[in-house]
Curated annotation (Swiss-Prot):
One Pfam match: Ribosomal_L18p
Encoding gene, per UniProt annotation: rplR
Gene Ontology biological process terms from the UniProt entry: translation
Gene3D superfamilies: 3.30.420.100
InterPro entries reported for this sequence: Ribosomal_uL18_bac-type (IPR004389), Ribosomal_uL18_bac/euk (IPR005484)
Alphabetized PANTHER family for the sequence: 39S RIBOSOMAL PROTEIN L18, MITOCHONDRIAL (PTHR12899), LARGE RIBOSOMAL SUBUNIT PROTEIN UL18M (PTHR12899:SF3)
Classification of source organism: Bacteria, Bacillati, Bacillota, Bacilli, Lactobacillales
Recorded superkingdom: Bacteria
Protein name: Large ribosomal subunit protein uL18
Record has Endoplasmic reticulum as a keyword: no
One GO CC annotation: cytosolic large ribosomal subunit
Protein backbone atom coordinates (compact mmCIF):
# COMPACT_ATOMS: atom_id res chain seq x y z
CA UNK A 1 0.00 0.00 0.00
CA UNK A 2 1.27 3.47 -0.88
CA UNK A 3 1.84 5.69 2.15
CA UNK A 4 0.23 9.12 2.11
CA UNK A 5 2.47 12.05 3.11
CA UNK A 6 1.54 13.89 6.30
CA UNK A 7 0.54 17.44 5.30
CA UNK A 8 1.58 18.95 8.62
CA UNK A 9 5.05 17.37 8.52
CA UNK A 10 5.55 18.71 5.00
CA UNK A 11 4.40 22.16 6.18
CA UNK A 12 6.77 22.06 9.16
CA UNK A 13 9.66 21.09 6.88
CA UNK A 14 8.80 24.01 4.55
CA UNK A 15 8.54 26.38 7.54
CA UNK A 16 11.98 25.34 8.88
CA UNK A 17 13.49 25.90 5.44
CA UNK A 18 11.97 29.39 5.13
CA UNK A 19 12.84 30.32 8.74
CA UNK A 20 16.49 29.69 7.97
CA UNK A 21 16.32 32.51 5.44
CA UNK A 22 14.26 35.16 7.26
CA UNK A 23 14.52 36.68 10.70
CA UNK A 24 12.84 39.54 12.53
CA UNK A 25 14.81 42.41 14.03
CA UNK A 26 13.83 45.29 16.30
CA UNK A 27 13.61 47.58 13.24
CA UNK A 28 11.67 45.10 11.12
CA UNK A 29 10.11 42.31 13.23
CA UNK A 30 8.58 39.11 11.87
CA UNK A 31 4.79 38.72 11.53
CA UNK A 32 4.27 35.01 12.15
CA UNK A 33 1.01 33.22 11.30
CA UNK A 34 -0.15 29.90 12.74
CA UNK A 35 -3.31 28.27 11.46
CA UNK A 36 -5.14 25.48 13.27
CA UNK A 37 -8.36 23.70 12.35
CA UNK A 38 -10.38 26.00 14.58
CA UNK A 39 -8.44 29.26 14.77
CA UNK A 40 -5.68 31.51 13.49
CA UNK A 41 -2.92 33.17 15.50
CA UNK A 42 -0.61 36.05 14.57
CA UNK A 43 2.45 37.35 16.43
CA UNK A 44 4.89 40.18 15.74
CA UNK A 45 8.25 38.83 16.93
CA UNK A 46 11.70 40.36 17.45
CA UNK A 47 13.91 37.30 16.89
CA UNK A 48 17.11 39.03 18.05
CA UNK A 49 15.70 39.66 21.54
CA UNK A 50 13.36 36.65 21.43
CA UNK A 51 10.36 38.78 22.37
CA UNK A 52 6.78 38.90 21.12
CA UNK A 53 5.92 42.56 20.53
CA UNK A 54 2.23 42.21 19.58
CA UNK A 55 -0.21 39.37 19.08
CA UNK A 56 -3.81 38.58 18.20
CA UNK A 57 -5.79 35.40 17.71
CA UNK A 58 -9.27 33.99 17.41
CA UNK A 59 -9.16 33.45 21.19
CA UNK A 60 -9.52 37.23 21.68
CA UNK A 61 -13.00 38.41 22.69
CA UNK A 62 -13.27 40.75 19.67
CA UNK A 63 -12.98 37.78 17.29
CA UNK A 64 -15.86 35.46 18.08
CA UNK A 65 -18.35 35.63 15.21
CA UNK A 66 -18.18 34.80 11.52
CA UNK A 67 -16.52 32.28 9.27
CA UNK A 68 -12.86 31.34 9.66
CA UNK A 69 -11.86 33.70 6.85
CA UNK A 70 -13.82 36.59 8.41
CA UNK A 71 -12.12 35.83 11.74
CA UNK A 72 -8.72 35.91 10.00
CA UNK A 73 -9.52 39.39 8.67
CA UNK A 74 -10.34 40.61 12.20
CA UNK A 75 -7.14 39.01 13.59
CA UNK A 76 -5.09 40.74 10.88
CA UNK A 77 -6.71 44.07 11.72
CA UNK A 78 -6.11 43.61 15.47
CA UNK A 79 -2.46 42.58 15.16
CA UNK A 80 -1.77 45.52 12.83
CA UNK A 81 -3.45 48.00 15.19
CA UNK A 82 -1.51 46.63 18.18
CA UNK A 83 1.79 46.73 16.29
CA UNK A 84 1.23 50.28 15.01
CA UNK A 85 0.34 51.37 18.57
CA UNK A 86 3.81 50.14 19.63
CA UNK A 87 5.49 52.07 16.81
CA UNK A 88 5.98 49.17 14.38
CA UNK A 89 5.16 49.96 10.76
CA UNK A 90 7.30 47.50 8.75
CA UNK A 91 7.41 43.74 9.26
CA UNK A 92 8.66 40.61 7.52
CA UNK A 93 5.73 38.29 6.72
CA UNK A 94 6.24 34.67 7.80
CA UNK A 95 3.37 32.58 6.47
CA UNK A 96 4.43 29.61 8.60
CA UNK A 97 4.81 27.20 5.70
CA UNK A 98 1.18 27.64 4.66
CA UNK A 99 0.17 28.56 1.13
CA UNK A 100 -0.50 32.28 0.63
CA UNK A 101 -4.20 31.63 0.07
CA UNK A 102 -7.47 31.73 1.97
CA UNK A 103 -7.17 32.58 5.67
CA UNK A 104 -3.45 33.41 5.52
CA UNK A 105 -4.00 35.80 2.60
CA UNK A 106 -7.04 37.37 4.29
CA UNK A 107 -5.00 38.03 7.45
CA UNK A 108 -2.12 39.52 5.45
CA UNK A 109 -4.39 41.79 3.41
CA UNK A 110 -6.17 43.05 6.55
CA UNK A 111 -2.82 43.75 8.25
CA UNK A 112 -1.67 45.74 5.20
CA UNK A 113 -4.90 47.76 5.11
CA UNK A 114 -4.45 48.69 8.78
CA UNK A 115 -0.94 50.10 8.58
CA UNK A 116 1.64 47.31 8.37
CA UNK A 117 4.02 47.32 5.40
CA UNK A 118 5.45 44.08 3.98
Amino acid sequence: MISKPDKNKIRQKRHRRVRGKLSGTADRPRLNVFRSNTGIYAQVIDDVAGVTLASASTLDKEVSKGTKTEQAVVVGKLVAERAVAKGISEVVFDRGGYLYHGRVKALADAARENGLKF
